[in-house]
Swiss-Prot record:
Keywords: Coiled coil, Membrane, Mitochondrion, Mitochondrion inner membrane, Transit peptide, Transmembrane, Transmembrane helix. Component of the mitochondrial contact site and cristae organizing system (MICOS) complex. Residues 205-220 have a biased composition (Basic and acidic residues). It is found in: Mitochondrion inner membrane. GO terms for biological process: cristae formation. Belongs to the MICOS complex subunit Mic60 family. Component of the MICOS complex, a large protein complex of the mitochondrial inner membrane that plays crucial roles in the maintenance of crista junctions, inner membrane architecture, and formation of contact sites to the outer membrane. Plays a role in keeping cristae membranes connected to the inner boundary membrane. Also promotes protein import via the mitochondrial intermembrane space assembly (MIA) pathway. This is MICOS complex subunit MIC60. Residues 131-633 are mitochondrial intermembrane.
């Protein structure tokens, strides 16, 4: 009746005879064989007031001396502790002088420190592997025994979080034994409603409470435990208490007996697939097992049945909600699938059209690129063919030279061999042959010199003609430094050509010279000014200048090669020589003028002199080239 009856009784220093609620049946069954010969007695505590037992859902006031226990406290007891007397410790002795550590001690300390650090590092790595995936992969892959340690830690964590998992249930079914309680015989005790303990194989004896009037005695069942070994392939049977059908009513001359109460059936939900419902079912079943084991099913039966009904209702509601959610989710998934199918069809159409467009564009670009590649390839082939042709020609020429040298060497070798063989008889022929070869070499050398001279002469002619062409083609004066440099490079060793080039005024080839048409145009302008100046006296005024300008336009001009030394005659002859291309005679005529006429024509004479110097130098160079060609002939 008292709550203290739920507490197990054990000898000080021994093990508890009742296991915890979550593991009561397997552990209790495994210890049954060791407890067959022992009897344990509950603590004799008399109730202070005869108060009726109260259900868990009602409020009751218990004694302060009685410790209230719960289902979690079942199977757990606290050993008595003895307080040791407190004594004042003696003062510590003075520390001994430090000794110098030996090599082996330092080695031992080093190894121990290394071992401790390694163990701490290994444990830290195992612990950190549970939080970091990257470190988990590194630790299990590269550290020895790291994977086994991490798996062991994860398994222990899983067992700690889910103690009633299926694996533990299978192990309990495989290792546990089945207890079959039995009730038989009669007891001399008076039926007092005390608890029928199932903690041990034999119930503990209790003293009969004192009463003024005698009470009828009732037979108290004496449960006995039998250890039944179950076969390996079959699961362990559940405890089967006796049913009411096995109860036999007492006879008239026998003391009264009450039928035993039916134990509470375990809760079972076939369609309970939710983890929460399964956990609730396991919890309720553990509670029912504890209540049945303590014989308190008469008091807690209605509450347990109510809890079972509530759990069944909750399971039904969860199942209905799950079905409703599944239907709703199926509808949403169906709508999403249709929407995705439509979107996928549209996307496929767009992708196909884009692919067709892209394919046509790529085909066009490919054709253009192939055309460019073909053209580049053809150009490259042409360049390569031309290069190969030149290389082949050079190789052929080199081969011919090598062959000529080889033939010459062979010839010389043959000659030497022949000379060695016929030295005495053909020494004269060898000398003649050597002289003939020397003559041929001299002749070949002479012809080479002739060819070089002819080539130099031709190049000299070409350079002179290039200078003349550059002077005659341009409408404006242009420098001809490059032509003169080329001409000097060709005739670098000829003193006549060098002297002719040196006689040319540097201003002429740096700025260029005027052409014949330019000289004639400039002469006409100069002639007008000279005519005006020829009509003026030495000390002329404004009127004289005006009259000379008028008379210069009114005077009749002469034609041809006019005779006389007057200014008009000289100008007429000069113009005639210019039109005929005789710059030398024209310059000589203009150089014969005096006074203002000569002063006005001084610049023109300078230009004509430059042209004549250049022409004279070119004539000298051309004459020298002809002379060299005649010398060669």
């Amino acid at each position: 009746m008292l709550r203290t009856s739920l507490r197990s009784v054990r000898v000080l220093g021994g093990r508890p005879s009742v296991a915890a609620a979550a593991r009561q049946w397997p552990v209790a069954a495994s210890r049954r064989a060791a407890l067959v010969g022992q009897r344990h007695y509950a603590v004799d505590k008399k109730p202070e007031s005869a108060s009726s037992p109260s259900l868990p859902n009602t409020q009751s006031v218990a004694s302060d001396k009685i410790h209230e226990t719960t289902i979690d406290d079942v199977g757990e007891t606290k050993a008595a502790t003895v307080d040791a007397p407190k004594t004042t410790p003696p003062p510590p002795p003075p520390p001994p002088a430090p000794k110098k550590k030996g090599f082996f001690r330092r080695l031992r300390n080093f190894v121990f420190t290394l071992f401790v650090l390694g163990a701490v590092g290994f444990a830290g790595g195992v612990w950190y592997s549970c939080f970091s995936d990257n470190f988990h992969d590194f630790f299990t892959g590269y550290v020895p025994f790291g994977e086994q340690a991490v798996l062991y830690l994860e398994e222990m964590e899983y067992k700690k979080r889910f103690p009633n998992s299926a694996t533990n249930a299978k192990s309990r079914d495989a290792d546990g034994a089945v207890r079959i309680p039995a009730q038989s015989g009669a007891s001399w005790r008076v039926a007092d409603g005390t608890r029928r303990s199932s903690a041990g194989p034999v119930p503990a004896k209790q003293e009969e409470p004192k009463a003024e009037a005698p009470k009828p005695k009732a037979a108290e069942p004496k449960p006995t435990a039998k250890v039944v070994e179950k076969p390996a392939p079959t699961p362990a049977p559940a405890p089967t208490p006796r049913s009411e059908s096995g109860f036999k009513a007492p006879e008239v001359n026998e003391p009264s007996r009450y039928p035993p109460l039916k134990p509470i059936d375990l809760l079972s939900l076939d369609d309970a697939r939710e983890p929460v419902i399964q956990d609730l079912v396991h919890m309720v079943n553990d509670l029912i097992l504890v209540i049945n084991a303590d014989g308190a099913h008469g008091r807690y039966g209605s509450s347990v049945n109510k809890a079972k009904n509530e759990i069944t209702k909750v399971g039904g509601k969860l199942k209905g909600m799950k079905e409703q959610f599944e239907k709703k989710a199926a509808g949403q998934v169906r709508d999403k699938i249709d929407e995705f199918d439509k979107a996928a069809t549209d996307l496929i159409d767009r992708v196909e059209s884009a692919m067709i467009t892209q394919e046509s564009q790529w085909r066009h670009e490919f054709e253009e690129e192939m055309k460019k590649v073909r053209e580049n390839y053809e150009d490259r082939v042409k360049v390569l063919l031309e290069r190969e042709r030149k290389l082949n020609e050079e190789k052929l020429q080199n081969q011919l030279l090598e062959q000529a040298l080889a033939l010459k060497k062979e010839f010389v070798k043959d000659v030497e061999n022949q000379v060695e063989q016929e030295r005495e008889s053909r020494l004269g022929k060898l000398t003649a042959l050597s002289s003939a070869v020397a003559d041929l070499e001299k002749l070949t050398t002479g012809w080479n010199e002739v060819l070089d001279t002819n080539l130099q002469t031709q190049q000299l002619h070409v350079a002179v003609e290039a200078v003349r062409a550059s002077l005659e083609d341009d409408h404006h004066p242009r420098p001809f430094i490059r032509e003169l440099v080329a001409l000097r490079e060709i005739a670098s060793d000829d003193p006549v050509v060098n002297a002719a080039i040196a006689s040319v005024n540097p201003t002429a080839y740096q700025r260029g010279i005027s052409t014949s048409s330019q000289l004639i145009d400039r002469f006409r302008r100069v002639a007008n000014e000279v005519r005006k100046a020829s009509l003026l006296p030495d000390e002329a005024g404004v009127a004289s200048h005006a009259s000379s300008w008028v008379l210069s336009h009114v005077m009749f001009k002469k034609q041809g090669l006019a005779e006389g030394n007057d200014v008009e005659s000289v100008l007429t002859r000069t113009q005639t020589y210019l039109e005929e291309g005789d710059l030398d005679s024209a310059a000589r005529e203009m150089n014969g003028l005096e006074g203002w006429a000569k002063t006005l024509s001084k610049d023109w004479l300078g230009e004509v002199r430059k042209v004549l110097e250049v022409q004279q130098a070119l004539d000298v160079i051309a004459t020298e080239a002809r002379l060299q060609s005649l010398r060669v002939d």
